From Swiss-Prot:
Its cofactor is Mg(2+). Catalyzes the addition and repair of the essential 3'-terminal CCA sequence in tRNAs without using a nucleic acid template. Adds these three nucleotides in the order of C, C, and A to the tRNA nucleotide-73, using CTP and ATP as substrates and producing inorganic pyrophosphate. tRNA 3'-terminal CCA addition is required both for tRNA processing and repair. Also involved in tRNA surveillance by mediating tandem CCA addition to generate a CCACCA at the 3' terminus of unstable tRNAs. While stable tRNAs receive only 3'-terminal CCA, unstable tRNAs are marked with CCACCA and rapidly degraded. The keyword S-adenosyl-L-methionine does not apply. Mg(2+) binds at D21, D23. It is an enzyme of class 2 (transferase). It comes from Pseudomonas putida (strain ATCC 700007 / DSM 6899 / JCM 31910 / BCRC 17059 / LMG 24140 / F1). A single active site specifically recognizes both ATP and CTP and is responsible for their addition. The gene is cca. One of its GO terms (molecular function) is magnesium ion binding. This is CCA-adding enzyme.
Amino acid sequence: MHIYKVGGAVRDRLLGRPVSDIDWLVVGATVEEMLAKGYRPVGADFPVFLHPKTGEEYALARTERKSGRGYGGFTFHASPDVTLEEDLIRRDLTINAMAEDEAGTVYDPYQGKQDLDKRLLRHVSPAFAEDPLRVLRVARFAARYAPLGFRVADETLALMRQISASGELQALTAERSWKEIERALMEVQPQVFFKVLSACGALQELLPELDDSSRTLAALEQAAVHEQPLHVRWACLLRGLSPTSIKAVNQRLKAPRECQELAMLTGECLAQGNQALELPATALLELLQKFDVYRRPQRFEDFLVVCEMAARGDGEQGYPQADYLRRAAAAARAVDVKPLVQAGLTGQALGEALKGERLKALEAYQRG
C-alpha cells in the first residue's frame, strides 16, 4: 500500500499558495484492507474512505470509462493493480495530475510542473473531452490563476469547443452547473471565467442571455475587486438583462433565493437607483417600499452596492445616489407608528396613514 497527496494540494504547494484541502490517493490496497485499518467508507460510486483520526478523504486508485452522457456517465474500476500513472491520467489538467509521497517526492508523469512554469492550463489526455463539467472547471481555474498569468492551452481550448458543440453541456444538471458558477464568481477574477466560456462556445450554451463584452463583465469585476459576497456578484453579472431574462436564468440554474431576489430587484430597479437624485418623493417611497427597507434594510444596502459597482464598471468616479438613497431610507424608517396606533388606526387605514407620514418625511428630506 502506498499513499500519496494528489491534485490541488501538490499544485498549490508548488505555486507557493496556501494549501487548504488535501486529497489522498491509496495505491495497492483493497477495500478490506482499508476497513481493517479503521477507515470509514463514504463513496457511493467508487471507494472513498475517511481517515479514522483526521477525517480526511482517502480514495483508492481507479480508472474510469465513458458509459453514458454527461458528468455522471462513467464506469469506474478500483483495484490494487491500478497504478499511480493510470489514476493520474484520468484527471483533467496536467497541473492537477501530480502526486507527492510521504517523503516529499513529487511524481509528475504528465509534465504538470512544466505547465506550472509555463503558466498553462493543459488537459492530460484526449479523455478530457468525455466530461462536460471540465469545461466549467478549466474556466474556473483560469479565473483563479489569471493573476499569476495562467491561460488555457490552445489544444485544450479546442477540446472545450468540441464539447460545447457536441451538446454534452446540456446533460449537466442545474445543480452541477450552478456549483461551478458559484465557485467561479468568488474567484479573484471571475470575469475571466465567463470570457473563457465565451471563447469555447460554452457561454452561448449555458447562459445565452449573456455576452462577454467588457460592459457586461465590468460590474462583476468591480464587485470582485471590492470583495463583495456571492449574491452581490450575481446581481452585478446580470444587471444588464431584462427582468424576464433574469428570471429565466435564475430558474434554469436554480440559483439560491438570496441571489435570485437581489438580481431580480436590480433588474427592476437599477434605472430608478441611477435616477434617484431626480425622483419625486412618491417614486422614492415606492422604491423603498419595493425593497421593504423597514424590515429588510440589508437587501436595500446590497442593491445600492450593486448600483455603485455598475457605475464604477461604467467608468463613473463616484455614485452620490447611494448616500442620497441611504439618507432617504433613514428618513422613512424614522417615522414613528405609535401616534397613529394611539389615534386608533388599524389595518388598511393604519397602513395608508403610515405611508402618508413617510411620504411627508421624504418630502421634508428632499427640501433639505
